[in-house]
Amino acid sequence: DSSGFNLPLAKKLRATYPTKEIIYYILPQAWAWKKGRVAKLEKYCTKLCSIIPFESEIYTDKNKITYVGHPLLDEIKEFKNELSNTNKIAFMPGSRKTEINNLLPIFKELVKKIPNKEYILIIPAKFDEEYIKKIYGDISAFTISKNTHEALKDSEYAFICSGTATLEAALIGTPFTLSY
């Protein structure tokens, strides 16, 4: 991930340690944009570990690239078999302070417009109570959850900050609105 940092690092490592193995895990989405990174990845890295099955198609050196699976598929243990009416709506305003500051006020307004539901605010497990009070402010309208997968599975719908959480919701089977 983060090719803006990792590609220059791989280049520097290759120049400094020409015989060392350089493994790149979670490849940049060169299939979507900036395809020129493919040649750089193949030049600087000895092994490319893909989390998306079709990524190998854009690389010329098939010996360097291996599909290793997606880490979320290992983490998520339960999936929805069908859509449910649990009367629970999940809200995930992100994990960065700016995301939370931008999205939480909107989510609080949404709560007022979607009556007769239980509103689940999913907060990253790493956040302590002091940080939560400081960053989130009044969240008394919400039930708090720090278990993303369980909360998404139990919710009939979610409003989610753009990022990995949208993939989690899609894999679990919870319909959502991507928020940015």
Descriptions of predicted regions:
Residues 28-32, 73-75, 139-144, 158-160:
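Short gly/ser/thr-rich secondary-structure transition/capping motifs
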Residues 146-180:
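A donor-sugar binding/catalytic signature common to diverse glycosyltransferases
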Residues 62-68, 87-88, 136-145:
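Active-site regions of enzymes building and remodeling cell-envelope glycoconjugates
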Residues 2-83, 90-104, 113, 124-128:
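Active-site and donor-binding regions of nucleotide-sugar-utilizing enzymes
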Residues 46, 87, 155-157:
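Conserved acidic residues
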Residues 98-154:
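Donor-nucleotide binding loops and adjacent catalytic segments primarily
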Residues 22, 89, 119-120, 176:
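Hydrophobic/aromatic residues located in beta-strands of well-ordered beta-sheets
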